[in-house]
């Protein structure tokens, strides 16, 4: 696939849709809800927030050059999903999503289907209004407006991103940070839900939200504040289908390995022993009672 243009090739959507159609045909009876692509906007999110360098710099990196050489293509022709950030890349990703939705429905599957986005709570400080609006359009709105016909939009949000006239700002000195280096800001979820629904017109499913920390008391505090934001949305009539915490178990967090601990259940990687945390008991109580104190 990468040798044929990857996620900038017009041939990719049909191949992806064929795959999704087969999954739905053979396993659809086991699926309660489907997300075709996880975080369709992730590449733009990482570059916009300064977490990942620009594509110009990435294509000059030794690993990128080696990968393209092994594939027999140029660095400019290497287009993995994570780096489909150009307008052509965005168009191909969204075409793949829409064709996948059609293929899933054509398979006879009846479960609701959508896509998930890393919806950024982009806020501006004095002087940053214009650039914040530009990033909001590039990262969020360009995708949220292209979900017509879906059953829902999956929202994944962990923190806010502040912008001044120069671009993304680091967290303020002395502010509480998570193990991911994010600002502790659970209120971001409410803002993300509001923007996702207002822009897409779709019901919202919170498909990821959580806290990487060694202090489980802070996890409970974070989730409680985030859920209060969800309740605010529900009270105003915004259709929020549900809330999914990330994650049940301490997970493998890509290049960060097992260092960040998001889980409601701890995992000892030496023995694989699982230990239920207080946050799991607390969240289970919220779910059973369907109330927040």
Regions found by a protein language model. Give the residues of each.
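Non-catalytic scaffold segments within catalytic domains of secreted glycoside hydrolases
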Residues: 1-293
């Amino acid at each position: 696939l990468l040798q044929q243009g990857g996620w900038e090739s017009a041939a990719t959507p049909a191949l992806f849709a064929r795959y999704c159609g087969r999954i739905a045909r053979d396993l659809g009876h086991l699926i309660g809800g489907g997300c075709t692509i996880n975080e369709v906007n992730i590449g733009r999110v990482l570059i916009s927030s300064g977490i990942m360098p620009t594509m110009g710099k990435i294509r000059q990196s030794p690993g990128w050059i080696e990968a393209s050489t092994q594939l027999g293509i140029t660095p400019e022709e290497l287009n993995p999903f994570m780096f489909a950030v150009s307008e052509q890349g965005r168009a191909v990703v969204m075409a793949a999503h829409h064709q996948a939705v059609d293929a899933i429905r054509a398979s006879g599957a009846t479960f609701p289907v959508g896509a998930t986005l890393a919806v950024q709570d982009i806020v501006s400080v004095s002087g940053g209004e214009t650039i914040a609006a530009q990033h909001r359009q590039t990262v969020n709105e360009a995708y949220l407006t292209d979900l017509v016909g879906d059953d829902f939009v999956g929202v994944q949000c962990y923190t806010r991103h502040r912008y001044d006239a120069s671009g993304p700002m680091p967290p303020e000195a002395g502010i509480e940070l998570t193990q991911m280096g994010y600002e502790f800001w659970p209120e971001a979820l409410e803002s993300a839900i509001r923007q996702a629904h207002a822009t897409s017109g779709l019901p919202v499913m919170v498909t990821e939200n959580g806290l990487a920390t060694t202090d489980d008391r802070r996890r409970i505090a974070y989730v409680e504040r985030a859920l209060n934001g969800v309740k605010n949305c529900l009270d105003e009539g915004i259709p929020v289908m549900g809330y999914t915490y990330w994650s049940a178990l301490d997970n493998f967090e890509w290049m960060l390995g097992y260092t960040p601990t998001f889980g409601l259940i701890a995992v000892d990687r030496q023995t694989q022993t699982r230990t239920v945390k207080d946050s799991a008991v607390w969240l289970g109580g919220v779910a059973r009672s369907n109330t927040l104190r």
